[in-house]
């Protein structure tokens, strides 16, 4: 299972079963922070507690399979190379924070990677459930299945007044972080994204880049997530975030039509230039690749550029990341110039199909 996860550009859950109309929403994610009752939190770095949590996680494979019918595997991070761990971060299957802490850290992963449980990160467990497109409710329902299967065998640290107890006070309560990853090229291109982000933050939500906190919104890809976990139910959190995202989708569509109406030829020029560069360039760095791939996806959505596969944008975003690229090519000793050359070649091959 590990080889499949590391070698495949897209996890099975991220592939679209039906034709997406405008590829604005890339994916939905639910994350539940949980700690076991009676054990010191991970940030205390208590070896005995870390060992116990690790042992509990290794015994979860059969109960989880019974809960949702998927096969589960346990992946010890200590047994992975640095580049393999970096690929898991690039694929959003592991947090950068977990990559930095190795002893007693592991992942419990479903066969389609729609469920990933990070063990001994900031909390004992971070249960992550993912789905393609805007499917927060589906992702949440799956997370609850897993959550209940674990809690049925190993009680969580829970307080009647405060809710689920977590290492960081900002997660206390529901322990729920719901997030949606969106591709917003027209809002970015028009400059309207700055004002929109300000409005979203004022409503109590966070806006981050492709790789979460502190990351840049490369390729016009943004993550929108809730911040409040106390005084609000899980259902209300999901309902409110869904409404926020639906509003963002409407604004992106409006911006696309505005760009077409105000200067269609200018827009076509930008999109065709990006297409031309990636069709013929011999070296492309990661940032330029994402920027121009974003332009091409917008051009495909607006029927300005030739159509490409329904998952091509997501595949190329994954393949052109530096760590996955070296894994994809089977060579971890590539120079930066080598990476830029191979990145350009991979993109040219995709565009020629």
What do the PLM-derived regions correspond to, one by one?
Residues 163-180:
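Conserved phosphate/anionic-ligand binding catalytic regions in large, soluble enzymes, centered on
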Residues 180-186:
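Alpha-helical support elements that line or immediately flank enzyme active sites
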């Amino acid at each position: 299972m590990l080889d499949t996860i590391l070698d495949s550009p897209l996890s099975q859950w991220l592939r679209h079963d039906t034709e997406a109309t405008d590829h604005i929403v890339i994916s939905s994610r639910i994350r539940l922070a949980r700690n076991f009752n009676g054990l010191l939190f991970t940030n205390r770095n208590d070896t005995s507690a870390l060992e116990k949590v690790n042992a509990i996680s290794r015994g979860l494979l059969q109960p989880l399979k019974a809960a949702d019918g998927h096969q589960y595997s346990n992946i010890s991070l200590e047994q992975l190379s640095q580049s393999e761990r970096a690929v898991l971060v690039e694929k959003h299957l592991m947090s950068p924070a977990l990559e930095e802490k190795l002893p007693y850290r592991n992942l419990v992963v479903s066969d389609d990677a729609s469920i990933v449980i990070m063990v001994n990160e900031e909390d004992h467990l971070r249960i992550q459930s993912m789905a393609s497109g805007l499917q927060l409710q589906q992702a949440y329902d799956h997370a609850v299945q897993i959550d209940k299967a674990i809690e049925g065998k190993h009680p969580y640290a829970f307080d009647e007044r405060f809710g689920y107890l977590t290492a960081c006070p900002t997660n206390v309560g529901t322990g729920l972080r719901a997030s949606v990853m969106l591709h917003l090229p027209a809002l970015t291109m028009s400059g309207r994204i700055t004002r929109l982000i300000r409005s979203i933050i004022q409503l109590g939500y966070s806006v981050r880049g492709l790789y979460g906190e502190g990351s840049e919104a490369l390729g016009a890809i943004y993550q929108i997530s809730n911040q409040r976990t106390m005084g609000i139910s899980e259902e209300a959190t999901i309902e409110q975030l869904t409404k926020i995202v639906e509003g963002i989708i409407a604004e992106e569509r409006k911006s696309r039509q505005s760009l077409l109406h105000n200067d269609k030829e200018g827009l076509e020029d930008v999109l065709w230039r990006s297409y031309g560069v990636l069709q013929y360039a011999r070296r492309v760095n990661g940032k330029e690749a994402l920027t121009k791939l974003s332009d091409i996806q917008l051009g495909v959505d607006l029927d300005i550029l030739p159509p490409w596969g329904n998952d091509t944008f997501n595949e190329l975003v994954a393949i052109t990341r530096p760590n996955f690229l070296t894994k994809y090519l089977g060579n971890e000793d590539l120079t930066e110039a080598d990476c830029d050359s191979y990145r350009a070649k991979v993109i040219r091959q995709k565009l020629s199909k």
